[in-house]
């Protein structure tokens, strides 16, 4: 699809029912540079997605032995290659490997498939049991009801469909059964973790629901016996509950989490929202991105006539509209707290009892790349207007500024390592920035930085989160975005051929 900018200027004023209102000058800024050299075989090679995938393959040879040290592929919170680490069946590995799977489907390069399969085969035994480490330990998932441990299950279905090896389906069926055991709050939402009772986090929608929807499609397609209706309805119920309880209608965006506890207490958090506060008060970009992608990927599997499908498509449109609105026009990226700009910081750090001023906000790479993937895929699938290709292109240009490629070396800058639910704006932006692969220890506690931190967000000297290079969420997000934005030569949005584009 080619966008003619003069024609676009003419039709935009007549668009009805969209919040994508674009001034002529803004259109020119967004659409003037198609940046087709990456997607259409231009001079600026190598492509970003392939470079990141090759970097992982070459840096971590993915040896079988759990004592492989720096050669292990375990990107769990970016602890390698600085220290030995076991392989984890965990989203921090599943996300970059799923991004690599997308690059495999885009390029047909078998080494990516072999790498992913080898990683999975060190964790799946002959009976389809999932092992925690790569040395055949019988220890199961660290807790099978933690949704973060379920995300790699999407790869199990992909590998089964590619190889027909029943081990992968057996392992997937075990995770499918585990989903039935996740505890629920009184309203019916899955607990994010047992340590966070009654809390549904947006993150969890991406971690488990696309897998369950894909598994339900296996039922529906008669590939395996089972109840597709229950699987699909479970998925849409979780998405709708998040929509019901975290949606901010003014901003068309979603808060990080909500709490269904009868006593209103947010348990397990270092800096929780106020007791009785049903939702968090912060619009964290990556949690919104997880929700956005979770819904988009679920739509791949959900039947066209499912009664909840239109509501899910509406969620995708709402978020897409907000992404246009809150995109940083200077960089093309999105901020860590998506709706806050540095010229309009919240008073008192976003909390009435805050003792320090609000800290600056900053662009976050992984969320930005996930948004690009979601926008581009939604355009391709027809969920949103083709005009959003402009937003996706600007976002992709911004993401590429955060990817440093020097020969075989790759650095993806500016990704937050992890983010618990917090009660204040400051708790989401009070970051320790380092340009290395390791997380490193938290700053030592001081009198003004207690352990655990105080109920309100801590003073500026107490960093609550880390921003690093080559964090796994960032590596995976960039490959996902590249799988949509870096097509084979001559292809445009909506004209992908030869590979499975789900």
Protein language model annotation of sequence segments:
Residues 14-23:
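Bacterial N-terminal signal peptides
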Residues 290-341:
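Oxyanion-binding "anion nests"
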Residues 215-233, 298-310, 378-386:
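Inter-helical turn/loop segments and adjacent helix faces that build the functional surface
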Residues 125-271:
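Extended ligand-binding groove/face enriched in aromatic
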Residues 55, 102, 122, 174-181, ...:
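Alpha-helical scaffold segments in carbohydrate-active enzymes
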Residues 41-94, 106-147, 151-153, 159-162, ...:
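CBM-like carbohydrate-recognition segments
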Residues 2-15:
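Bacterial N-terminal signal peptides that target proteins for export
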Residues 30-32:
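Boundary of Sec targeting at the N-terminus
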């Amino acid at each position: 699809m080619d966008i003619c900018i003069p024609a676009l200027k003419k039709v935009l004023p007549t668009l009805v029912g969209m919040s994508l209102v674009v001034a002529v000058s803004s259109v020119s800024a967004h659409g003037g540079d198609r940046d087709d050299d990456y997607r259409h075989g231009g001079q600026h090679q190598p492509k970003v997605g392939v470079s990141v995938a090759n970097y992982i393959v070459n840096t971590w040879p993915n040896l079988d032995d759990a004592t492989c040290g720096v050669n292990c592929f375990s990107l769990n919170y970016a602890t390698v290659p600085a220290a030995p680490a076991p392989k984890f069946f965990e989203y921090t590995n599943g996300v970059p490997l799923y991004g690599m799977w997308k690059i495999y489907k885009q390029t047909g390069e078998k080494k990516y498939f072999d790498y992913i399969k080898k990683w999975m085969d060190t964790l799946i035994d002959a009976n389809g049991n999932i092992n925690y480490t790569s040395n055949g330990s019988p220890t199961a998932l660290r807790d099978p009801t933690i949704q973060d441990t379920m995300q790699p299950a999407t790869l199990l279905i992909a590998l089964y469909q590619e190889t027909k090896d029943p081990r992968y389906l057996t392992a997937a069926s075990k995770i499918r059964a585990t989903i039935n055991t996740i505890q629920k709050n009184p309203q019916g939402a899955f607990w994010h973790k047992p340590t966070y009772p009654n809390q549904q986090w947006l993150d969890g929608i991406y971690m488990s629901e696309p897998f369950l929807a894909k598994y339900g499609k296996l039922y529906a397609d008669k590939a395996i016996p089972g109840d597709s209706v229950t699987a699909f309805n479970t998925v849409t119920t979780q998405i709708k509950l998040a929509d019901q309880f975290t949606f901010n209608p003014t901003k068309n965006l979603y808060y990080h989490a909500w709490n269904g506890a009868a006593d209103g207490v947010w348990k397990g958090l270092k800096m929780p929202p106020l007791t009785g506060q049903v939702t968090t008060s912060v619009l964290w970009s990556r949690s919104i991105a997880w929700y956005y992608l979770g819904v988009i990927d679920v739509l791949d599997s959900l039947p066209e006539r499912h009664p909840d499908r239109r509501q899910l498509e509406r969620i995708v449109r709402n978020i897409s509209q907000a992404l246009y609105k809150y995109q940083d026009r200077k960089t093309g990226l999105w901020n860590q707290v998506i709706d806050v700009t540095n010229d309009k910081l919240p008073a008192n750090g976003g909390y009435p009892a805050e003792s320090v001023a609000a800290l600056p906000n900053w662009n976050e790479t992984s969320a930005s790349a996930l948004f690009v993937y979601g926008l581009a895929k939604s355009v391709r699938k027809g969920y949103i207007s083709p005009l959003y290709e402009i937003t996706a292109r600007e976002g992709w240009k911004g993401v590429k500024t955060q990817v440093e490629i020097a020969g075989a070396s790759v650095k993806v800058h500016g990704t937050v390592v992890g983010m618990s639910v917090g009660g204040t704006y400051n708790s989401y932006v009070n970051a320790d920035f380092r340009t290395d692969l390791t997380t490193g220890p938290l700053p030592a506690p001081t009198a003004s930085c207690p352990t655990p931190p105080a109920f309100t967000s801590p003073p500026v000297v107490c960093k609550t989160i880390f921003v690093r290079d080559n964090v796994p969420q960032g590596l995976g997000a960039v490959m996902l975005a590249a799988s949509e934005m870096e097509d084979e030569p001559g292809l445009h949005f909506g004209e992908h051929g030869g590979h499975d584009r789900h």
